[in-house]
Amino acid sequence: MYWTEKHWIKLAIIVFIALPVISFILGSAIMLSYTYWPTDYSKMKMPHIDPMTQNIVLIAHGRGDTPASWAAPLKVILEQKISSPRDTAQVIALDWSAYSSSIFRCSVDGMRIGHALGETIAESAELQSVHLIGHSCGAYVVLGLCESLKAKRNDIEVQSTYLAPVSIYGALFWNYGINHFGDCANFSEAYIDSEDGVAGSNQLIPNTHTFNVTDARKATRSSKSPHIWPTYYYLQLVRSGVYPSLRTTSDLWATYPQGQMEKIDALPHKK
C-alpha cells in the first residue's frame, strides 16, 4: 500500500490527538469510578451514642491519620473541661483511619461516614447540642454529619470547627469545601495556616470565622508543618479554656463575625 500525505495526516491525528484523548477519558473514568465506588464501611467501628446524653463533641482526624496524634489527647482535655454532675456530655474521638488514607476517596468516604453518623445521632431524644471538630479530610465527616443531623433535627444546635480543612471533594470539585464548610451549622470557625500547601487549607472559609494562626507558629518557632499546626494550636486553645463554644456563649457570631479572617500571633494563655 502506498501511503499518501492524507494517510500520514490521519496517523498523526490518531497518535497525537485521538489516543491521548481516549487515554485521558479512560483514565478519568477509572479514577472517578474508584473515587465514588460504594463501600459498606464494615472495617470501622461506629461509636456508641449514650441515649441520655444532652451534648456531644465529636472529633475527626484527617487523611492518613489516627486519633492518637491529636484527637485522643483533645478528647481527654475536653472531658476535663466540660464534664459536670449537672451536664451530661459525651466526647468521641472518631477512628475512621480504615477509610481515610486515600487522597482521592477520603473526602467522599468522610462525607458518607458523616451522613451515617448524623442519622444515628439524630435518634438521641435528649440531645441538645453537638460540637463537631475535623482536621484535613476529617472536615468532610463534620460537614456530612452536620447536614444529615440538621435534616432530621434542626432543633439541635451545631457548632463546627474546621482545622486546616481540605477543600477538594472527590478529586473533582476543588472549591467544594470552601463553598460549603460551615453553611449548615449554628456557628462555625476555622483555623488555618496561610503557608499550608493543601488546597483550601490556607485561606478564608466564607461561612466561618477564620483564624489565621500562621504567625503563632512562627512566633513559637514550631517544627510542625503548616498543615498540622492548626491541630496543635487548637489543643492549646482548648487547654487554655478560652475557645469559642456554643455551650458557654449563645451568640458567637457577635464576637466572631462570619466571613472574617482574624490573625493570631501567639499561643493562648491559660486562664
Please name every model-derived segment.
Residues I49-N55:
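Proline/glycine-enriched tight loop/beta-turn segments at coil->beta junctions
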Residues Y2-S42:
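N-terminal membrane-anchoring alpha-helices
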Residues D40, N55, G62-R63, A68-I77, ...:
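Serine-dependent carboxylesterase/thioesterase catalytic core
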